[in-house]
Protein backbone atom coordinates (compact mmCIF):
# COMPACT_ATOMS: atom_id res chain seq x y z
CA UNK A 1 0.00 0.00 0.00
CA UNK A 2 0.99 3.65 -0.26
CA UNK A 3 1.40 5.99 2.69
CA UNK A 4 2.49 9.61 2.85
CA UNK A 5 5.12 11.22 5.05
CA UNK A 6 4.88 14.97 5.55
CA UNK A 7 7.96 16.92 6.68
CA UNK A 8 8.08 20.16 8.65
CA UNK A 9 9.02 21.98 5.42
CA UNK A 10 5.64 20.93 3.98
CA UNK A 11 7.15 18.42 1.53
CA UNK A 12 5.20 15.15 1.16
CA UNK A 13 7.04 11.88 0.49
CA UNK A 14 5.15 8.85 -0.91
CA UNK A 15 6.25 5.40 0.30
CA UNK A 16 5.35 1.87 -0.79
CA UNK A 17 4.91 -0.23 2.35
CA UNK A 18 3.30 -3.36 3.82
CA UNK A 19 1.13 -3.32 6.98
CA UNK A 20 3.72 -5.71 8.47
CA UNK A 21 6.60 -3.23 7.94
CA UNK A 22 8.19 -2.00 11.17
CA UNK A 23 8.70 1.69 11.88
CA UNK A 24 12.42 0.93 11.54
CA UNK A 25 11.77 -0.32 7.97
CA UNK A 26 9.82 2.85 7.18
CA UNK A 27 12.69 5.03 8.47
CA UNK A 28 15.09 3.07 6.23
CA UNK A 29 12.85 3.81 3.22
CA UNK A 30 12.84 7.51 4.15
CA UNK A 31 16.65 7.38 4.37
CA UNK A 32 16.77 5.85 0.86
CA UNK A 33 14.57 8.63 -0.53
CA UNK A 34 15.76 11.65 1.46
CA UNK A 35 19.15 10.72 2.92
CA UNK A 36 18.04 11.38 6.53
CA UNK A 37 19.63 8.88 8.97
CA UNK A 38 16.99 6.87 10.89
CA UNK A 39 18.40 8.00 14.28
CA UNK A 40 17.51 11.59 13.36
CA UNK A 41 13.93 10.72 12.39
CA UNK A 42 10.85 10.88 14.62
CA UNK A 43 7.60 9.69 13.05
CA UNK A 44 4.28 10.89 14.43
CA UNK A 45 0.81 9.48 13.67
CA UNK A 46 -2.44 10.51 15.36
CA UNK A 47 -0.41 12.60 17.81
CA UNK A 48 1.77 9.67 18.91
CA UNK A 49 5.48 9.11 18.37
CA UNK A 50 5.99 5.72 16.68
CA UNK A 51 8.34 3.15 18.23
CA UNK A 52 10.93 1.44 15.98
CA UNK A 53 10.03 -2.17 16.82
CA UNK A 54 6.28 -1.82 16.21
CA UNK A 55 4.56 -2.34 12.84
CA UNK A 56 2.31 -0.09 10.80
CA UNK A 57 -0.63 -2.41 11.54
CA UNK A 58 0.09 -2.10 15.30
CA UNK A 59 -0.72 1.60 14.95
CA UNK A 60 -3.67 0.98 12.58
CA UNK A 61 -1.85 2.86 9.81
CA UNK A 62 -3.73 2.07 6.62
CA UNK A 63 -3.36 2.92 2.95
CA UNK A 64 -3.01 6.62 2.23
CA UNK A 65 -2.49 7.47 5.90
CA UNK A 66 -0.20 10.46 6.50
CA UNK A 67 2.68 10.31 8.98
CA UNK A 68 4.54 13.41 10.14
CA UNK A 69 8.33 13.45 10.12
CA UNK A 70 10.14 15.53 12.74
CA UNK A 71 13.92 15.69 12.81
CA UNK A 72 15.61 14.71 16.06
CA UNK A 73 18.56 17.06 16.57
CA UNK A 74 21.77 15.53 17.89
CA UNK A 75 21.12 16.75 21.42
CA UNK A 76 17.64 15.18 21.54
CA UNK A 77 16.63 13.74 24.92
CA UNK A 78 13.63 12.62 26.93
CA UNK A 79 12.35 14.40 30.00
CA UNK A 80 9.38 13.67 32.25
CA UNK A 81 6.65 16.00 33.44
CA UNK A 82 4.72 15.00 36.55
CA UNK A 83 1.27 16.49 37.15
CA UNK A 84 -0.45 17.07 40.49
CA UNK A 85 -2.69 14.06 39.74
CA UNK A 86 0.45 11.88 39.70
CA UNK A 87 0.35 11.30 35.92
CA UNK A 88 3.77 11.36 34.22
CA UNK A 89 4.11 12.70 30.67
CA UNK A 90 7.19 11.85 28.56
CA UNK A 91 8.48 14.56 26.21
CA UNK A 92 11.08 14.53 23.45
CA UNK A 93 13.09 17.74 23.78
CA UNK A 94 16.37 19.45 22.96
CA UNK A 95 18.56 21.23 25.55
CA UNK A 96 18.04 24.36 23.43
CA UNK A 97 14.22 24.17 23.72
CA UNK A 98 12.70 27.11 25.57
CA UNK A 99 10.25 26.61 28.41
CA UNK A 100 7.66 28.06 26.03
CA UNK A 101 8.42 25.22 23.56
CA UNK A 102 8.05 22.67 26.34
CA UNK A 103 4.66 24.12 27.32
CA UNK A 104 3.57 23.87 23.67
CA UNK A 105 4.56 20.17 23.65
CA UNK A 106 2.53 19.64 26.84
CA UNK A 107 -0.41 21.37 25.17
CA UNK A 108 -0.07 19.00 22.18
CA UNK A 109 -0.14 15.97 24.48
CA UNK A 110 -2.56 17.06 27.19
CA UNK A 111 -4.55 19.98 25.77
CA UNK A 112 -3.56 22.35 28.61
CA UNK A 113 -3.06 25.92 27.33
CA UNK A 114 0.48 27.22 28.00
CA UNK A 115 -0.83 30.24 29.91
CA UNK A 116 -2.34 27.88 32.51
CA UNK A 117 0.91 25.93 32.96
CA UNK A 118 3.58 26.58 35.59
CA UNK A 119 6.64 24.33 35.35
CA UNK A 120 8.79 23.74 38.43
CA UNK A 121 12.29 22.19 38.53
CA UNK A 122 14.54 22.01 41.59
CA UNK A 123 12.04 24.18 43.46
CA UNK A 124 12.15 27.01 40.90
CA UNK A 125 9.39 28.18 38.60
CA UNK A 126 10.73 28.15 35.02
CA UNK A 127 10.49 31.34 32.92
CA UNK A 128 9.17 31.07 29.33
CA UNK A 129 12.11 32.70 27.55
CA UNK A 130 14.81 30.57 29.20
CA UNK A 131 16.03 27.22 27.82
CA UNK A 132 16.25 23.77 29.40
CA UNK A 133 20.05 24.05 29.37
CA UNK A 134 19.83 27.40 31.23
CA UNK A 135 18.27 25.47 34.11
CA UNK A 136 20.67 22.50 33.75
CA UNK A 137 17.74 20.21 32.89
CA UNK A 138 19.28 17.04 31.50
CA UNK A 139 17.99 13.80 30.01
CA UNK A 140 15.43 12.01 32.16
CA UNK A 141 15.02 15.00 34.49
CA UNK A 142 11.53 15.35 35.98
CA UNK A 143 9.68 18.67 35.90
CA UNK A 144 6.54 19.30 37.95
CA UNK A 145 3.48 20.81 36.28
CA UNK A 146 1.22 23.02 38.38
CA UNK A 147 -1.89 24.56 36.86
CA UNK A 148 -2.02 28.33 37.01
CA UNK A 149 -5.41 29.23 38.38
CA UNK A 150 -7.29 31.94 36.60
CA UNK A 151 -5.99 34.27 39.34
CA UNK A 152 -2.58 34.50 37.59
CA UNK A 153 -1.58 38.15 37.17
CA UNK A 154 1.21 40.54 36.27
CA UNK A 155 2.90 42.84 38.75
CA UNK A 156 5.73 45.33 38.31
CA UNK A 157 8.89 45.74 40.35
CA UNK A 158 10.67 49.10 40.16
CA UNK A 159 14.36 49.28 41.07
CA UNK A 160 16.26 52.28 42.44
CA UNK A 161 17.83 52.74 38.97
CA UNK A 162 14.32 53.32 37.58
CA UNK A 163 14.20 50.00 35.69
CA UNK A 164 10.82 48.23 35.81
CA UNK A 165 10.65 44.41 35.84
CA UNK A 166 7.41 42.61 34.90
CA UNK A 167 6.61 39.39 36.78
CA UNK A 168 3.94 36.69 36.29
CA UNK A 169 2.63 35.79 39.74
CA UNK A 170 -0.29 34.26 41.64
CA UNK A 171 -2.00 35.98 44.60
CA UNK A 172 -0.93 32.91 46.61
CA UNK A 173 2.79 33.39 45.80
CA UNK A 174 4.92 34.18 48.84
CA UNK A 175 7.31 37.13 48.93
CA UNK A 176 10.06 34.48 48.91
CA UNK A 177 8.69 33.16 45.57
CA UNK A 178 8.64 36.70 44.18
CA UNK A 179 12.28 37.25 45.21
CA UNK A 180 13.21 33.97 43.47
CA UNK A 181 11.54 35.23 40.26
CA UNK A 182 13.50 38.48 40.54
CA UNK A 183 16.69 36.44 40.99
CA UNK A 184 15.85 34.45 37.82
CA UNK A 185 15.32 37.66 35.83
CA UNK A 186 17.98 39.94 37.32
CA UNK A 187 20.48 37.70 39.12
CA UNK A 188 20.04 39.48 42.49
CA UNK A 189 20.22 37.00 45.41
CA UNK A 190 17.01 37.01 47.50
CA UNK A 191 18.94 37.81 50.69
CA UNK A 192 20.01 41.13 49.13
CA UNK A 193 16.45 42.09 48.15
CA UNK A 194 14.03 44.19 50.19
CA UNK A 195 10.58 44.61 48.63
CA UNK A 196 8.43 47.59 49.60
CA UNK A 197 4.71 48.08 48.90
CA UNK A 198 2.55 50.92 50.22
CA UNK A 199 5.50 52.00 52.37
CA UNK A 200 5.87 48.61 54.08
CA UNK A 201 8.74 46.14 53.82
CA UNK A 202 7.31 42.75 52.77
CA UNK A 203 8.09 39.66 54.88
CA UNK A 204 9.27 36.47 53.11
CA UNK A 205 6.68 34.09 54.51
CA UNK A 206 3.64 36.25 53.70
CA UNK A 207 1.73 36.10 50.38
CA UNK A 208 0.89 38.80 47.86
CA UNK A 209 -2.79 38.50 48.82
CA UNK A 210 -1.86 39.06 52.50
CA UNK A 211 -0.64 42.51 51.46
CA UNK A 212 -3.58 43.10 49.07
CA UNK A 213 -1.16 43.26 46.13
CA UNK A 214 -3.32 43.00 43.01
CA UNK A 215 -2.75 42.82 39.27
CA UNK A 216 -0.52 45.57 37.92
CA UNK A 217 0.52 46.71 41.41
CA UNK A 218 4.05 48.13 41.59
CA UNK A 219 6.52 46.97 44.24
CA UNK A 220 9.77 48.81 44.94
CA UNK A 221 13.01 46.86 45.13
CA UNK A 222 15.70 48.15 47.47
CA UNK A 223 19.02 46.35 47.68
CA UNK A 224 19.93 45.19 51.15
CA UNK A 225 23.48 46.32 51.72
CA UNK A 226 25.85 43.77 53.11
CA UNK A 227 25.26 45.51 56.46
CA UNK A 228 21.80 43.89 56.69
CA UNK A 229 21.44 42.09 60.03
CA UNK A 230 19.05 40.43 62.43
CA UNK A 231 18.15 41.82 65.84
CA UNK A 232 15.81 40.51 68.51
CA UNK A 233 13.04 42.31 70.37
CA UNK A 234 11.87 40.83 73.66
CA UNK A 235 8.37 41.67 74.92
CA UNK A 236 7.06 41.72 78.49
CA UNK A 237 5.35 38.38 77.89
CA UNK A 238 8.77 36.87 77.20
CA UNK A 239 8.10 36.48 73.46
CA UNK A 240 11.09 37.21 71.21
CA UNK A 241 10.56 38.79 67.78
CA UNK A 242 13.26 38.56 65.09
CA UNK A 243 13.67 41.56 62.79
CA UNK A 244 15.67 42.11 59.59
CA UNK A 245 17.23 45.58 59.84
CA UNK A 246 20.04 47.81 58.57
CA UNK A 247 22.37 49.77 60.89
CA UNK A 248 20.98 52.88 59.14
CA UNK A 249 17.35 52.06 60.11
CA UNK A 250 15.80 54.62 62.45
CA UNK A 251 14.06 53.60 65.67
CA UNK A 252 10.87 54.73 63.90
CA UNK A 253 11.55 52.16 61.14
CA UNK A 254 12.10 49.47 63.74
CA UNK A 255 8.79 50.31 65.43
CA UNK A 256 7.05 50.08 62.02
CA UNK A 257 8.55 46.59 61.52
CA UNK A 258 7.27 45.59 64.97
CA UNK A 259 3.84 46.91 64.02
CA UNK A 260 3.92 44.79 60.82
CA UNK A 261 4.78 41.66 62.81
CA UNK A 262 2.78 42.19 65.99
CA UNK A 263 0.14 44.82 65.22
CA UNK A 264 1.29 47.17 68.03
CA UNK A 265 1.01 50.84 66.98
CA UNK A 266 4.37 52.66 67.13
CA UNK A 267 2.99 55.29 69.51
CA UNK A 268 2.39 52.54 72.10
CA UNK A 269 5.95 51.18 71.81
CA UNK A 270 8.98 52.09 73.93
CA UNK A 271 12.24 50.40 72.97
CA UNK A 272 14.99 49.97 75.56
CA UNK A 273 18.62 49.01 74.87
CA UNK A 274 21.44 48.98 77.44
CA UNK A 275 19.07 50.63 79.92
CA UNK A 276 18.28 53.56 77.60
CA UNK A 277 14.98 54.45 75.94
CA UNK A 278 15.60 54.83 72.19
CA UNK A 279 14.51 58.02 70.40
CA UNK A 280 12.53 57.76 67.14
CA UNK A 281 14.78 59.93 64.95
CA UNK A 282 18.04 58.18 65.88
CA UNK A 283 19.46 55.13 64.05
CA UNK A 284 20.49 51.71 65.31
CA UNK A 285 24.13 52.57 64.60
CA UNK A 286 23.78 55.74 66.73
CA UNK A 287 23.13 53.44 69.68
CA UNK A 288 25.80 50.90 68.61
CA UNK A 289 23.12 48.24 68.17
CA UNK A 290 24.79 45.43 66.25
CA UNK A 291 23.71 42.13 64.76
CA UNK A 292 21.90 39.82 67.18
CA UNK A 293 21.52 42.57 69.79
CA UNK A 294 18.36 42.29 71.92
CA UNK A 295 16.07 45.27 72.47
CA UNK A 296 13.31 45.27 75.09
CA UNK A 297 9.82 46.38 74.15
CA UNK A 298 7.69 48.11 76.80
CA UNK A 299 4.09 49.05 76.04
CA UNK A 300 3.01 52.63 76.59
CA UNK A 301 -0.51 52.36 78.06
CA UNK A 302 -3.20 54.75 76.86
CA UNK A 303 -3.17 56.91 80.00
CA UNK A 304 0.51 57.70 79.64
CA UNK A 305 1.42 55.09 82.27
CA UNK A 306 4.08 52.50 81.39
CA UNK A 307 4.03 48.80 82.03
CA UNK A 308 7.18 48.05 84.03
CA UNK A 309 9.94 46.31 82.10
CA UNK A 310 11.23 43.03 83.45
CA UNK A 311 14.76 42.48 82.21
Curated annotation (Swiss-Prot):
- Annotated site residues (Interacts with activating enzyme) in this chain: 54, 72
Question: Known InterPro entries for this protein?
Answer: Ubiquitin-like_dom (IPR000626), Ubiquitin-like_domsf (IPR029071), Ubiquitin_CS (IPR019954), Ubiquitin_dom (IPR019956), Ubiquitin_ubiquitin-like (IPR050158)
One GO cellular component this record assigns the protein to is: nucleus
Similarity remark? Belongs to the ubiquitin family.
Pinpoint the Ubiquitin-like domain residues.
1-76, 77-152, 153-228, 229-304
Q: What is this protein called?
A: Polyubiquitin-B
Residues annotated as carrying ADP-ribosylglycine in the record are 76
What CDD domains does this protein's entry cite?
Answer: Ubl_ubiquitin
- What is the gene name? UBB
Q: Where is this site: Essential for function?
A: 68
Q: Which PANTHER family match?
A: UBIQUITIN
Q: Does the keyword Membrane apply?
A: yes
What does the subunit comment say? Answer: Interacts with SKP1-KMD2A and SKP1-KMD2B complexes.
Organism of origin: Cavia porcellus (Guinea pig)
Cross-link (Glycyl lysine isopeptide (Gly-Lys) (interchain with K-? in acceptor proteins)) at residue(s): 76
The record makes one more remark, namely:
Ubiquitin is encoded by 4 different genes. UBA52 and RPS27A genes code for a single copy of ubiquitin fused to the ribosomal proteins eL40 and eS31, respectively. UBB and UBC genes code for a polyubiquitin precursor with exact head to tail repeats, the number of repeats differ between species and strains.
